[in-house]
């Protein structure tokens, strides 16, 4: 069909059923901008007298509405006049509404000499795709409202992610909706890019309008803003949930500490514990020792200690007895003697090792005998130390 044929066809459809340029372009698969440029001249005079919207009731000038009430017999005449005016206005409005209903009915009941756009129940993937004609010859219109349809696959993916992260019921619901919306938005973005690419391939050289690249850039900007908003929403939900979890843990910990302190005081009374033992019990169970108990422990540590286990062996001043001191002294002396004997034995072993390995004994370091040196006479100013010789070699030597 040429544009002249389109002009005649659009003029007839617009005159019979109130067709718009956008509906005509979508039905006949035309470029909306090009169709609007060629068919705009036929839009102004296509409406009939019945299809035009009724004019609003003209309000009378203020001077003509002034009523002389000098001859009114009753005060109710003013109210009756107002009621009559309201009834007249309501009648005009009712007539306009009825006229609009008749107009819509004529549009819906238009003649069947042209194709009608039909929409069938399809899956999300099919609804996001723009089909030309199916097997039955029906045309499916592509609308932006298809993106708002709930995506079952996106919901399942969101639930799987939330099960791995761990969340409560309220947070799960909010994050599930946000994540599914994010996944559907990404799916819609990819589908729009593919559709624009197909449109660019099908676009003719003489068609003018918005370039496909500009549409892709505009769509990507919108998707980026929406994705950033959804990410911020998910991040804020997670932060709020973690904050509430920390507050709940602090509250539970404070309540648990109160129970631990109460249990420690009960055990202290039952088992006759000291304050220090009660404090150890509280710390062992992860509690915090109360300030009063800390002050009592400090006071007990500052007080002088007295040993009253054996009062018979204690002096008047509380010092240990002489028998205890003598016993302690004997034990320390025996310990010192044992340490001295052990030290002497260790030193002898070190000296013997030095003599044997350094060549100062009967055999030098190379295994040669030192008898020649031992048989030499002493110098005039040297004397033999018999005591040392006896200790080293014995009496037989």
From Swiss-Prot:
Superkingdom per UniProt: Viruses
Compositional bias per record (Acidic residues), positions renumbered to this chain: 374-387
Extent of Basic and acidic residues compositional bias: 43-53, 388-397
Record GO terms (molecular function): DNA binding; nuclease activity
Swiss-Prot/TrEMBL keywords: DNA-binding, Hydrolase, Nuclease
Keyword Hydrolase: yes
The keyword DNA-binding appears for this protein: yes
Region (Disordered): 43-62, 304-325, 356-397
Subunit structure: Multimer of two distinct subunits.
Function statement: Necessary for recognition and cleavage of the phage packaging site (pac), together with the pacB protein. Both are probably the two major subunits of the phage PACase.
Protein name as annotated: Terminase A protein
UniProt source species: Enterobacteria phage P7 (Bacteriophage P7)
């Amino acid at each position: 069909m040429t544009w002249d044929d389109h002009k005649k066809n659009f003029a007839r459809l617009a005159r019979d059923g109130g067709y718009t340029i956008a509906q005509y372009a979508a039905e006949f698969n035309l470029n909306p901008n090009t169709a609007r440029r060629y068919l705009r001249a036929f839009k102004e005079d296509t409406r009939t007298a019945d299809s035009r919207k009724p004019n609003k009731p003209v309000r009378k000038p203020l001077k003509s509405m002034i009523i002389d009430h000098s001859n009114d017999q009753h005060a109710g005449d003013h109210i009756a006049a107002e009621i009559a005016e309201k009834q007249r206005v309501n009648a005009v409005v009712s007539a306009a509404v009825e006229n609009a209903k008749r107009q819509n009915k004529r549009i819906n009941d238009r003649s069947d000499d042209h194709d009608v756009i039909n929409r069938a129940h399809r899956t999300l993937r099919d609804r996001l795709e723009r089909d030309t004609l199916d097997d039955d010859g029906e045309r499916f219109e592509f609308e932006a409202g298809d993106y708002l349809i709930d995506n079952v696959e996106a919901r399942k993916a969101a639930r799987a992610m939330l099960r791995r992260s761990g969340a409560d019921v309220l947070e799960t619901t909010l994050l599930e909706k946000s994540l599914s919306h994010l996944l559907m938005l990404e799916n819609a973005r990819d589908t729009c890019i593919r559709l624009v690419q197909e449109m660019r391939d099908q676009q003719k050289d003489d068609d003018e309008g918005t370039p496909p690249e500009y549409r892709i850039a505009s769509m990507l900007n919108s998707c980026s803003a929406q994705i950033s908003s959804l990410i911020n929403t998910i991040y804020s939900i997670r932060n709020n949930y973690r904050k509430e979890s920390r507050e709940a843990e602090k509250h539970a910990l404070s309540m648990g500490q109160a129970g631990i302190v109460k249990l420690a005081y009960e055990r202290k009374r039952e088992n006759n514990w000291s304050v220090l033992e009660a404090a150890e019990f509280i710390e062992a169970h992860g509690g915090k020792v109360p300030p009063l108990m800390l002050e009592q422990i400090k006071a007990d540590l500052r007080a002088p200690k007295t040993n009253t286990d054996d009062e018979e062996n204690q002096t008047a001043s509380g010092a240990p007895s002489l028998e205890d001191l003598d016993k302690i002294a004997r034990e320390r002396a025996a310990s010192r003697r044992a340490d001295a004997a052990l030290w002497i034995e260790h030193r002898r072993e070190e000296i013997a090792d030095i003599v044997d390995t350094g060549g100062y004994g009967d055999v030098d370091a190379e295994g040669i005998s030192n008898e020649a040196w031992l048989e030499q006479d002493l110098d005039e100013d040297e004397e033999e130390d018999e005591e040392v010789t006896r200790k080293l070699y014995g009496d037989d030597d």
